[in-house]
Amino acid sequence: MNSNYETAELEQLLSLNAPLENVEARWQRKARQNNSNTNNNNGNNGGDRFIPNKMNIDIGHFNLTKENSNPNPNAINNNSSTSTSTTATSSTTNNIESTLYKDTLANQLFESNSGDLESKILSFKSKAPVGNVSSSTNSLRVLYSQNQVGSTPTDQSLKKQFRQIPQQPERILDAPDIVDDYYLNLLDWSSQNVIAIPLGQTVYLWNATTSEIQRLFQVEQQDDYITSLQWTKDGNYLAVGTNSCTIQLWDVAHTKKVRELRGHAGRVGALAWNDYILSSGSSDTNIFNHDVRVQNHHVSTLSGHSQEVCGLKWSHDGGQLASGGNDNIINIWDINSENFETPAHTFEQHTAAVRALAWCPFQPNLLATGGGAADRTIRFWNTITGVCLNTVDTMSQVCSIQWSTTYRELVSSHGYSQNQLCVWKYPSMVKCAELTGHTSRALHTAISPDGETVVSASADETLRFWRVFEKENKLPTANRKSKEVSDGSMMRNINSLIR
């Protein structure tokens, strides 16, 4: 009895079983200690850089040395009456010198802040994102989800700049007996999705929708051959230039020659339509404008070249005609000027023949031109002011240029040594892709009506189809591969027909 009573009394005195009140948990004490240490270590200024304040040491050392070197030991006693005023004056002087020293040092370190000692060296503005993180969620997952590429409009625009361009052609067709001549224009793609190309003495039509092939006509004379061709805007008629100095107009739907235009004294190597006006460039150095509606079709002659005219292009609004020649000259003819038969501008910066001409579809009065093997440059011109806006050295002969109607880009075809197609981003002229495969120079290019595919015709006797400007949200990859397989079988049949 006594022992049990004594044990109960002892437990009551020690209160071993009673819970402790108003006692902080261990993690709370640790957090409070860390906060107190952090507050003690922080300076009053709260800046992110510490500069020691030692600028008064030299002044103090000077004063001590001056006092110790005083030859009169009684000077201190004699001047005891003025010690108070001397101390005040010295303190004021020290403060002024200290301020000047601070300002000088601050101006050297903080030039942009004009001596603001409270300014920070580094400024961190973009903070890590904060999400609703529960106890069971990894906190780093919030950072990963918030900082993925494409989460902001800027990232999305950067992502679009680096789109995928297929490096292999989508289709390859045989083009036997195509003429290997830099000064001719032998390929065009109509608005009805039909490609026209002369092989030998025969003009062939290939329907890109149905994959059907058609022989349009063959020249009659044995020594004659096709030198140029151009579709009308609606795709119903085809103009064909020949080595016999004539131009033939064909109704494709009825496979019928509508008329024949004469007048040139040399082969017709370049053609360009502007509504019912057909412009033709010849090796006789002249450009003829024909009104195909009337019997007397020849309406004007443009004489501005001294050698063969090998490039002709009307602007999209029909107001200007660009011509390039073997004399390395580009002429701009303004139809709205009082004297249309005199070039509004003449550009002589190219050092080789100029056949590659292309008007920009999204910026008026912007013309891209390409020079031959001795020049190798692409130049951009403002055809109103006559100023050369930019020049890019492509390191190879420029055969043709095509602008994209979907992107702010253009594609150029080249000769020796790579025989490649280059895709450029405008206006930076950064090379987006380089498409190789031709074993000889890619003389001609044309773009499809939907603006996605570029076809190239080469002296290696092949046609290659490149899906360069593919639009977004297209068919899945599996469907596209199955389509390519079916197209491949069609191509073999077409090649056998051509052969």
From Swiss-Prot:
Cellular compartments annotated: Nucleus
Location (main, coarse): nucleus
Native organism: Dictyostelium discoideum (Social amoeba)
| Known pathway | Protein modification; protein ubiquitination
| Extent of Low complexity compositional bias | 34-43, 67-92
As for family, the record states:
Belongs to the WD repeat CDC20/Fizzy family.
* Entry keyword set: Cell cycle, Cell division, Mitosis, Nucleus, Repeat, Ubl conjugation pathway, WD repeat
Q: Which GO terms describe its molecular function?
A: anaphase-promoting complex binding; ubiquitin ligase activator activity
Q: Name one GO cellular component term.
A: anaphase-promoting complex
Query: Please, which domain of life does this record's source organism belong to?
Result: Eukaryota
InterPro entries on file:
Cdc20/Fizzy, WD40/YVTN_repeat-like_dom_sf, WD40_CDC20-Fz, WD40_repeat_CS, WD40_repeat_dom_sf, WD40_rpt
Give the protein name, as stated in the record: Anaphase-promoting complex subunit cdc20
WD repeat segments run 179-216, 221-260, 263-300, 304-343, 349-391, 393-434, 437-476
Q: Where is this region: Disordered?
A: 28-92
Function (record text): Component of the anaphase promoting complex/cyclosome (APC/C), a cell cycle-regulated E3 ubiquitin-protein ligase complex that controls progression through mitosis and the G1 phase of the cell cycle.
SUPFAM superfamilies to which the protein is assigned, alphabetical: WD40 repeat-like
What GO biological process terms does the UniProt entry carry, in alphabetical order? anaphase-promoting complex-dependent catabolic process; cell division; positive regulation of anaphase-promoting complex-dependent catabolic process; protein ubiquitination
Q: How does it assemble?
A: The APC/C is composed of at least 13 subunits that stay tightly associated throughout the cell cycle: anapc1, anapc2, anapc3, anapc4, anapc5, anapc6, anapc7, anapc8, anapc10, anapc11, cdc20, cdc26 and cdh1.
